[in-house]
Regions:
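Histidine/cysteine-enriched polar flanking segments
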Residues: 1-261
Length: 261
């Protein structure tokens, strides 16, 4: 493990205690070299409370002292007023992510930096686009996450990634490539996507909650006051088996099927 087994286990336990997930990030085109300090982004993705913060730590072990449940209280932290995109480029987990993700990250970084207002930002907060370690969903590479909301997109090629970014800046979600939102369980994410697609809810804040009412039924609460019940079941796709990762054999595809009740 890049951090060593002991530190990696400690960080994982610390993040689990705060109901958080840890990702490595680096700026596109960099080799991930240690420059003497480490930039840290902390995203609060709970619907209605989304926020994004940045800070710098001297050592990776300093993560263990960060109260990531209350990032606004961390000394020296900066609240960001713009979205951030993460592109999975984790080639060790799946070479497809590196082959497809790195070019997308580089192009999107150029696009995003040109879509800012031109104001100078502190070094720790200037980057809008980052390469990241394994995000899951590698069979949908290139995979993209938009923070602070935690919206995840699949098959986000260069043109699609630019569209997703521009919509996020305007407070919108791209529905065609949307796979879910990190604040909810996997079937809960399928329920939200189904409701958004059915009623064309493209606003970032159009869905305010997803509640599990029974084992397979979810209540999707919308900002307009409406609520929709959705049954979600996991099943094997009707599509032919396909490789789960680059260079691997075919594997049957499991999918969540969502039905509005």
């Amino acid at each position: 493990h890049a951090l060593g087994e002991e530190l990696a286990s400690q960080i994982k336990a610390h993040m689990n205690a705060h109901n958080a997930r840890f990702q490595f990030i680096r700026e596109p085109g960099s080799g991930g070299q240690d420059s003497g300090g480490h930039r840290v982004l902390i995203a609060e993705s709970t619907p209605g409370h989304e926020a994004l913060y940045a800070t710098t730590i001297g050592s990776v072990s300093d993560l263990l002292s960060l109260d990531v449940s209350h990032p606004e209280t961390i000394p020296g932290v900066t609240a960001l007023d713009f979205p951030v995109a993460l592109i999975c480029t984790h080639g060790k987990r799946d070479v497809c992510c590196a082959l497809k993700g790195r070019p997308v990250a580089a192009l999107l970084s150029q696009h995003a930096s040109g879509s800012t207002d031109g104001a100078d930002a502190p070094e720790t907060t200037s980057a809008r686009v980052w390469e990241t370690s394994h995000t899951g969903g590698h069979r949908f590479a290139p995979a993209m996450i938009v923070l602070p909301w935690g919206f995840t997109y699949g098959r986000a090629g260069a043109q699609a990634a630019r569209q997703i970014w521009d919509l996020a800046v305007d407070g919108q979600v791209e529905l065609d490539m949307l796979r879910g939102r990190s604040a909810f369980s996997k079937p809960g994410q399928a329920a939200e996507v189904a409701v958004r697609s059915r009623f064309h809810l493209t606003g970032l804040a159009d869905v305010v909650a997803v509640e599990n009412t029974t084992e397979s039924v979810f209540r999707v609460v919308c900002a307009d006051g409406n609520a929709h019940s959705v049954e979600v079941v996991q099943t094997v796709s009707d599509l032919p088996a396909r490789p789960a990762t680059c260079g691997k054999g075919d594997k049957e595809v499991k999918v969540f099927r969502a039905t509005l009740l």
